[in-house]
Design a protein with these regions (language model features):
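Structural signature of the two symmetry-related core transmembrane helices
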Residues: 79-94, 179
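Helix-loop boundary and gating motifs at the non-cytosolic
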Residues: 3-61, 216-251
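Helix-loop junctions at membrane interfaces in 12-TM secondary transporters
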Residues: 94-108
């Protein structure tokens, strides 16, 4: 087991938290301006933006089951997490090219595949690292670092936009800067030691469904209805811009 830190959680939990912190800084620097860049610089329609965002959300969940199943079957966590974070970083490099509808749409959808691959194995890795009595606290620390990145990223974007103005050159600068924390996250993850779990078979989906409690199954219905009302935050950014907010204030 990893040595506890002064925060009362294993050091590797904090390392994985730093990975999420850096990744979210990178991603949120991009997400804050993506919709505006897609529609105003690349010339994409809002309808097409909605399609791209929908495909991106689908991609973000498309490989969850496979990644979790294969991670359990092999007893490995780090290769899946490293592949997911590495893939997302690689896709962000597409933004270095001249922005077009095709390149921006390709980035947005393919980059989310990395999230789908890394999510379940990383969470299983966290659960294996943390002491059982403090597992909830360990996940809380990791989530806090993740959310901190989601705050820092837009603040950086705000500063760059306020300094340089909302121009195509500024968007290109933001996309280039976003690669720095993304690359750093992969380097940090590469240094985290992996403790392999014993390989185990995962129950068939039908068997696993039957094992779920009736209360949980009833919860899925309202949760699904709430999800149906979800809309891309990009539309909120566009609406705020149309109402007269400055681009940096929208971010």
């Amino acid at each position: 087991m990893a040595t506890p830190t002064r925060w009362g959680t294993p050091a590797d939990v904090l390392r994985l938290g730093r990975v999420s912190l850096l990744t979210d800084i990178s991603s949120e620097m991009i997400v804050g301006v993506f919709a505006l860049c897609f529609t105003t610089v690349a010339g994409g329609s809002t309808a097409l933006l909605g399609l791209v965002e929908g495909l991106a959300d689908a991609a973000a969940a498309s490989l969850d089951f496979w990644a979790g199943w294969w991670s359990d079957r092999t007893g490995r966590r780090k290769p899946f997490a490293l592949a997911g974070y590495g893939w997302s970083t690689l896709m962000k490099s597409l933004l270095l090219a001249s922005p077009s509808v095709a390149s921006l749409a390709t980035f947005r959808v393919l980059e989310r595949l990395g999230k789908s691959v890394r999510g379940p194995p990383r969470d299983a890795w966290l659960a294996a690292i943390a002491p059982e009595a403090r597992r909830g606290y360990a996940f809380g620390v990791h989530t806090a670092l993740d959310k901190a990145g989601a705050v820092i990223g837009p603040l950086i974007a705000y500063g760059v936009l306020a300094w340089r103005g909302a121009t195509p050159a500024t968007y290109a600068l933001l996309f280039a800067l976003a690669l720095i924390p993304a690359l750093a996250s992969v380097l940090v993850l590469a240094r985290v030691a992996e403790r392999r779990s014993p390989p185990r078979e995962r129950a068939a989906l039908r068997v696993a469904w039957r094992a779920l409690s009736p209360q949980f199954k009833r919860y899925l219905l309202p949760a699904g209805l709430v999800a149906l009302g979800y809309f891309s935050v990009g539309f909120l950014f566009l609406r705020a811009r149309a109402m007269g907010f400055a681009v940096q204030d929208v971010v």
